[in-house]
Structure formats: C-alpha cells, structure tokens
Amino acid sequence: MQRSFTPSKRSLHVRLITWFILPPIMLLAAGEIYIRLQPNPSKFKHHFLTLHNSEVDTLILGSSHTYYGIEPEVLGKHAFSLAQVSQTLKYDNYLLHHYPFENLRMVILPISDFSLYEDLEDGPEWHMASRYRLYMQCDIHSRWSAYGWEFTSFPTYCTKLKQLWTPSQMSWSRQGQGLEYTLDSRQEPWDNGTERALHNRYETFEKAPYGMKHLHEIGTYCARRSIKLVLISTPLSESYRKAQHCAQVEDTDRHIRDFIRMFPNTTYLDFRSSKSFSNHDFYDADHLNRAGAHKLTSTIASCLRNAPNTVSSTTR
C-alpha cells in the first residue's frame, strides 16, 4: 500500500518562513547593495583623499554652508572641500585626523548658528551619520550598529531607491564643492529666513561645551602643525538675520571670542551681514548659490592676502 505524505508542522513553518520572510529580506539586501554602489559625495571625497591626501594644502570643512558656499578652485588647484551637508564639528574634527594631510597649510571652517550645539546623532538627520561608516571607513560607530546600514532609516532608504527610475540631482566638482545650488534652480519663495532661522535655532546652550571641545581639538591640531585656521560665518539674508535667536548668536560670538584668545593665530571672517552680497547671490536665506560662492571665496582669498591674521568685522 502506498503511504500518503503529510508534512509536519515544523516543515510547514519552515516553508512559510521561506515563502513569506525570505523574499522581503532578499529585496531589502538587493536595495542595500544597489544604494551602496551609487556615487555620492562621501564616497567621492574618501576615494579622492585616499589617493591624494598628501597633495592637499587647503582643506575646507563644515556643513552645507561651505559645501555649497565655497569654491575650492578659487583657492588653488590643491584646495579640497571635505564639507558635507549637515556635517557637525564632531565629524570635522574626526575627518581632519582621519586622513594623513602631510602638506596641509590652511583649514577653513564655518561657524553657523547651529555649529556649537548640534549633535548629528540626536537630531532628525541622524541617518546621515551612516555615510562616515559606510563610505569613509570611519569607526565612530560599529559596522553592526544602526549607522552601518542604509535601510535602518527606511524612509531615506526608499528615497534613495528612487534613483532606479529618477536620476539623482546631486553633483559635485573635482575639488569637492556641491554644484546643485544655482540661481536658475532655486525655488520661490527663496528668502525663507524665518523658516531657516527656526530650523537652526536652539533654545538652550548646554551642548556648547561639547561643540567647543571639538573646536579646541581642531585648533590644537592646526597650532601644533603650523596650519592656518580660518573661521568664517557665511552671508545671511536680511530676513534670516531678523529671525535669529539673539541669545544664541550672542552665546556663539562669546565662545568664538574666547577661542580666538586661546588660539590667537586664528583668522575669523564674519560675512553674516555683509552688504557685498545681493539677492542674486543666494540660493535660500542662509545658503549661497554658485555665483555667490564664487564671490565669497574670492573675497576670502583677498582678505587672507591682505590681512592674514585679522578678526574681521569690516566684512559686515
């Protein structure tokens, strides 16, 4: 007599897991691999510095204010921008120590409203910290942490997967500047000062010592190697300046004055209220477009030639 085969409950469970769980996992893994293979600014910058770090004599650090707002080419063929969107002082400090800059002569670092108070991992853009682990071989976070994968921020993961059918608009120069912010591409109303000032606003300043710790380490690194440190505050539209949190601005200014007293060879160039920049130079209320970036970088180069150790308020 032929026996009929009845699958056990265990084998049935295994099949169900295989049919319903494995396909989504495989799709997730495929998406992860696809995203990691795509070009991005972090991957480009790491590749460039792995090969050419010894050639860099001027290094631009910072957030989107310098990623878009400074044109390295104006500063010379050996200038390079390591700035990235939402990059904090913690990562500026880390990256400065991460690559062996044997011939570095100058570091340019922005001081913005949020600089002393922002901790990337504690904010809504925490997922951006993964770029340092995934694409720049930084070991601040474990490979197996939430910062070791793209999919752990699922909304961002899904947005990046859209590159399958919509090409990315990100672009950058050979020396690391972000190129998307042009006058033609800016959206109206561009002068969103109230919105942007609120985005960068901190009501309490208890994190300032943490930010200053990293700034002091950058200052010490530069001083020990006779590297010129240039702090800059980039131009702001009038609507942005009117919406700034005065106590936050005063706290930042006080800390920067103290820093310069400790590191007197630091140059500070303050362009926040500079009248040299018109509406045509801005992309939004606190970012310059490419034309504005060219103007700002040319002005910085001129200031450094004429008064290399000036704490400038005449740029206002």
Residue ranges and their predicted role:
Residues 15-34:
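Hydrophobic membrane-insertion alpha-helices, especially the h-region
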Residues 2, 120-225, 314-316:
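Secreted/periplasmic serine-hydrolase-like ester/acetyl group-modifying domain
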